[in-house]
Amino acid sequence: MSSSNSNNGGPPLAPRLARFVRQDVQNMHAYAIQPSDGFVKLDAMENPHRLPAALQAELGRRLGALAINRYPGTRTDELRAALARHAGLPPGCALMLGNGSDELISLLSMACDVPGATVLAPLPGFVMYEMSARLQGLRFVGVPLTADFELDAAAMLAAVREHRPALTYLAYPNNPTANLWDDAVIERVVDAVREHGGLVVIDEAYQPFASRSYIDRLAHHDHVLLMRTLSKFGLAGVRLGYLMGPTALVAEIDKVRPPYNVSVLNCEAALFALEHEDEFARQAAVLRAERARLLDALRAMSGATPFPSEANMVLVRVPDAKAAFEGLKARGVLVKNVSGLHPLLANCLRLTVGLPEENDQMIAALKGILS
């Protein structure tokens, strides 16, 4: 969130209207999405694979047959059941749906907005944890990672003791650093939060590309929630996230969910994807192999320092991130310059793992820039 006023280039809000809009909202910059037409788009951690033609046609028929004149019905129950099977939801746990993970994060902030509540998360991390907390009027505390992007155990435990957060977010893997944190440290944080009376949200947005999941530990804790999305599964355009955890806890969060928050189109597309999860598993395997190839190429590249990745992105440090970003853009490749997001990310670019030919173009372009 920014401290300077932004109206996205339009005329200023009239004073008679401005007094009805929160000042902190007026001081924000809207979330900026880079124009991507004509570029190799490797800036948003999307799955670059499109559905095979036969599956596209089948999905089109399914969506075309929907009664879009009706509100969503029992198909959302079927989707919850299908996701529970897909995820391996443990006994004693429940699952709720969100219009993407962003909505789930907002619902968590809303449900946990008790007087004096604090949200805690490691930094650098996903920007929506802080943005959602502040928009809901909650205090946000960020705890810096170590220089190699690991959880700082001592700092995290001290922050939990001092601030007693209502919500603690742990991304597994983390965005934008792409790494999986040490499980022993995570469990120490989870135990500390239990001792001081808050909730922990494990964010597994990048689970299809990771070597480990928290799902088997979920049933061991009555204060831990696990959040996932179908965006990295291959459905970023569908906007569907889901939250799992102890039944009683999920039931409370679900009370603040708007009715019909998942459209019939989103629901049917997600069910279709789960029916063909073997195709999406194949795509994820290709991306994991391409990630390894990209990492090898970056390690061999003069001036590039890549960091380990368990996601569909690679964080790399270069001598001049701004120059490299602009150079890639001039060569038709769009990545994310994250160097301004946090001091630990100085001169870092976040590269999404793309199709083989896209990765080839990005590797060649970056090699030319750094040579």
Curated annotation (Swiss-Prot):
UniProt keyword list: Amino-acid biosynthesis, Aminotransferase, Histidine biosynthesis, Pyridoxal phosphate, Transferase
Q: Which reaction does it catalyse?
A: L-histidinol phosphate + 2-oxoglutarate = 3-(imidazol-4-yl)-2-oxopropyl phosphate + L-glutamate
Class in the EC hierarchy, top level: transferase
| The protein's Enzyme Commission number | 2.6.1.9
Cystines in this chain: none
Per the record, the pathway is:
Amino-acid biosynthesis; L-histidine biosynthesis; L-histidine from 5-phospho-alpha-D-ribose 1-diphosphate: step 7/9
N-terminal signal peptide: none
The protein's matches in InterPro entries, at most eight in alphabetical order, are given as: Aminotransferase_I/II_large (IPR004839), HisP_aminotrans (IPR005861), PyrdxlP-dep_Trfase (IPR015424), PyrdxlP-dep_Trfase_major (IPR015421), PyrdxlP-dep_Trfase_small (IPR015422)
Taxonomic superkingdom: Bacteria
GO:BP terms for this protein? L-histidine biosynthetic process
List the GO molecular function terms: histidinol-phosphate transaminase activity; pyridoxal phosphate binding
Co-factor(s): pyridoxal 5'-phosphate
Residues bearing N6-(pyridoxal phosphate)lysine?
Answer: 232
The record describes its quaternary structure and partners as: Homodimer.
| NCBIfam families per record | hisC
Q: Which HAMAP family match?
A: HisC_aminotrans_2
Q: Family per UniProt?
A: Belongs to the class-II pyridoxal-phosphate-dependent aminotransferase family. Histidinol-phosphate aminotransferase subfamily.
Protein name per its UniProtKB record: Histidinol-phosphate aminotransferase
Q: What is the lineage of its organism?
A: Bacteria, Pseudomonadati, Pseudomonadota, Betaproteobacteria, Burkholderiales
Quote the gene name from the UniProt entry: hisC
